[in-house]
């Protein structure tokens, strides 16, 4: 979270110099009150300020202005308040309050109290404010939690879903499987098992992509070829074509490329179809495929390079 983006809240605070000492509250110290709370005091014609209003504003100043001159005085006051964290938790959970202020409260609790529930509250409010943009910070926090506690079920559960959202199905599956080993609640287990079942095809594709990237073509082939007769995803055929190309099985590569491109004529797929035709001796067909993609202005950075090299070869053959 970018703390600086919340500093505008300092302009919504009014500072009061108490005339007399009030317990831990000292003279000659500027104590903060939210302007909206100050307005209510004036509106209701109150002479005294409830110390709770000071306590509500102090964490905002402490979080947003680390060099504030009365920082130590504020911290001393907070130390004297029994269960101050519970008081602030109540404010952070108040759905009628400003979300940014609630988030600052949660941040303060997370940073100053050793309670995992305050971390969870902070992440919850972070997600409420930033939606999907909060995921990277949430992942970092939950991964640190898991590193320090291998039985942190909730962290594993959330990490499984976060990586699923990012379409990183390998990590998602790994975290979900660790979670399942720890979870005893049947309903939760069934939920996660259902998600893993839905994501199996994506996991398989991603794992195959990984093996292709590290040139482990046999491992990629073994994953892709499983249940090939029931394959509903054209990416299975596309990556099988890539594997066959890389292992020199050009006839099979062409067969898979044709199958992959039946329902999807994307630039990536058509490049592979052209390469497979070229490797199978169908130079004219390969050129025709790439020329068609160029005319459609739907091509990859490599399409033009492939086309130029193939045309050069055809020209040399025709001389």
Q: Predicted regions span which residues?
A:
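Solenoid-like repeat scaffolds
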Residues: 78, 107-114, 142-151, 180-182, ...
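Generic helix N-cap/helix-start motif at coil->alpha-helix transitions
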Residues: 50, 80-89, 113-119, 149-156, ...
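Long, mid-chain structured domain cores
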Residues: 53-147, 151-161
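Alpha-helical adaptor scaffolds
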Residues: 120-136, 205-263, 267-268
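Residue at a conserved register position within TPR or TPR-like alpha-solenoid repeats
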Residues: 95-96, 126, 163, 211, ...
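Structural motif corresponding to the intra-repeat A-B loop/turn of tetratricopeptide repeats
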Residues: 96-98, 129-132, 166, 214, ...
């Amino acid at each position: 979270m970018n703390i600086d983006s919340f500093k505008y809240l300092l302009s919504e605070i009014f500072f009061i110099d108490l005339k007399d000492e009030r317990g831990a509250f000292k003279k000659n110290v500027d104590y903060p009150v939210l302007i909206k709370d100050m307005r209510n005091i004036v509106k209701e014609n109150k002479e005294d300020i409830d110390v709770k209003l000071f306590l509500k504003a102090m964490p905002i100043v402490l979080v947003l202005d680390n060099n504030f001159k009365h920082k130590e005085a504020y911290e001393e006051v907070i130390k004297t308040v029994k269960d101050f964290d519970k008081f602030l938790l109540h404010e952070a959970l108040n759905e009628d309050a400003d979300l940014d202020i609630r988030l600052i409260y949660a941040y303060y609790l997370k940073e100053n109290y050793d309670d995992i529930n305050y971390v969870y509250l902070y992440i919850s409010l972070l997600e409420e404010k930033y939606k999907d943009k909060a995921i990277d910070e949430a992942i970092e926090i939950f991964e640190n939690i898991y590193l320090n506690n291998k039985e942190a079920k909730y962290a594993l559960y959330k990490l499984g879903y976060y990586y699923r959202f990012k379409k990183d199905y390998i990590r998602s599956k790994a975290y979900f499987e660790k979670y399942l080993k720890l979870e005893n609640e049947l309903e939760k287990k069934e939920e996660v098992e259902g998600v893993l079942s839905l994501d199996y095809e994506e996991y398989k594709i991603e794992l195959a992509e990984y093996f292709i990237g590290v040139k482990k073509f046999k491992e990629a082939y073994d994953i892709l070829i499983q249940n090939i007769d029931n394959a509903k995803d054209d990416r299975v055929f596309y990556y099988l074509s890539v594997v066959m190309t890389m292992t020199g099985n050009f006839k099979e590569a062409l067969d898979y490329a044709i199958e992959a491109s039946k329902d999807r004529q994307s630039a990536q797929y058509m490049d592979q179809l052209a390469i497979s035709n070229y490797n199978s001796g169908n130079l004219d067909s390969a050129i025709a495929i790439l020329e068609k993609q160029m005319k459609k202005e739907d091509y990859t950075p490599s399409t033009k390079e492939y086309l130029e090299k193939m045309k050069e070869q055809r020209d040399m053959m025709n001389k």
